[in-house]
Amino acid sequence: MPGEGGTLPAVEYPYFPDRQHAFVWRNWTLVPAARLAEVLATSEENVNRLAASMGLRPQRGIEPYWSDARGYITVLRRNWHLLPYDQLLTLLGLTREELAWRLIEDDFLFVKLGNVKPACEPLRYRAPDERAMRGAARIDSLLGTFGREAFAREEPRFSFIEEFRRPRP
């Protein structure tokens, strides 16, 4: 895999209580909870609890295009600094060969990701400690301040494609 075994430290997300909370937050509207649980080697119930602790609404149907050739780049970018390659493969549902090809051949994606794969330790579920629970409650409180509906209303991804397909008067 390109850049495998790199030593560049991954970007940290200090506004999240820990990496597992960041992982759930960044993927909640893109990847089904069952797949997130598989990546974290835990139950779907634990993933749902992490999400709820940050004030995220229960998942609605996740569009399948996030794992196809149109959407996987978004998922990959959101997790490049969170997960090692093996867990990215699980998250994306790709083989090593498929991901290697996409990184090198698909629009020079590896170059756009910085020409390096940051060093990421495997991410496994751990029951949140008191500090993590306080951090998640702070995020929940912030969502309450701004109004939860502001974050729940999303225009469907790639909806602009349908707009382009409509005949113009």
Tell me what each language-model feature is:
Residues 1-169:
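Mature N-terminal, pre-catalytic/accessory segment of carbohydrate-active enzymes
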